[in-house]
Amino acid sequence: MAWAVITHPDGDHCGGSAEIKRRYPQVRLACGDLDRAMIESPDYLFSFRYDAYRANHGIYFDPKTAQDIKNCSSSAQAVTFTFVGGETLRLGENRILEIWHLPGHSHGHLGLYDRSHRTLYYGDAIQGAGYKSVQGMWSLCPTYLYVNAYLQTIRTIEASDAELIVGCHWPVLRGKEAIRQFCAESRNFVTHADRRITHYIRDHRSGVTLRELCTELSEQLGEWPLAVSLELANAISGHLDRGIEAGRFAVDRSACPFVYRLSDKREEG
């Protein structure tokens, strides 16, 4: 094994890097430059990505689930290279892979494009309307975090000349129409979620919490089990951050948990 390119920082994608290095000492480990800190440190990955909503929102995993998440990673492991997008890997005389930057699910999320076969390996870069189990049942909501970047990634894939795209939790998609439909499904979820969040905040003038938005909007946004409703914290927090930046929402950070409202300018409008 010459290369192991890690698409993004989640335990099921980077947790085995130390074991890969142990088994294949010569391997070059690589990841997105903006994700390096989390990928190299399981402790930082857990605190920044999986325990991110504890202090300000009172949302966190129960001890057993938290331990299961930690168990996905073996030990800390440095990477050899980081990529920012635009690089190429030559695997053979006629085999070149392009490194694409596909942020949204993480800041440094990478994709690998095999131009000779018009095949994109996109990891978790776009997520349709959520995750399904191998039995075809809805199991989890979309878990993007950075809305504008995620929408740009959808556009990037949609506009590419890829004719086959391979993700990590979704069926392989063949042909322009299938790819276009999945991109549209991914974008439509974002639009629908943003609308629902805005309407809910508008209808609750005294303010709402992130937990409340997750539990109250879960059934309106998808068919995954109610037990995983709080996983919406990832996407919804991204929409809230974007709304605050755009002046649509305001946040009271003196409250614990944080409370969100329409901004004064939005209410006046």
What are these regions (language model features)?
Residues 96-188:
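Metallo-beta-lactamase
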Residues 1-90, 184:
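Active-site HxH/HxHxD metal-binding segment of metal-dependent hydrolases
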Residues 81-83, 103-106, 269:
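A short catalytic or substrate-binding loop motif that flags glycine-/basic-rich loops and adjacent residues
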Residues 8, 20, 32, 83, ...:
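Divalent metal-coordination and catalytic microenvironments
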Residues 2, 15, 20-23, 27-30, ...:
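A structural signal for the main folded, soluble domain(s) of proteins
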Residues 195-269:
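C-terminal regulatory/interaction regions
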Residues 14, 150, 236:
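Aromatic/hydrophobic pocket-lining residues that form the small-molecule binding cavity
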Residues 38-43, 130-134, 197:
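Short, charged, surface-exposed secondary-structure boundary motifs
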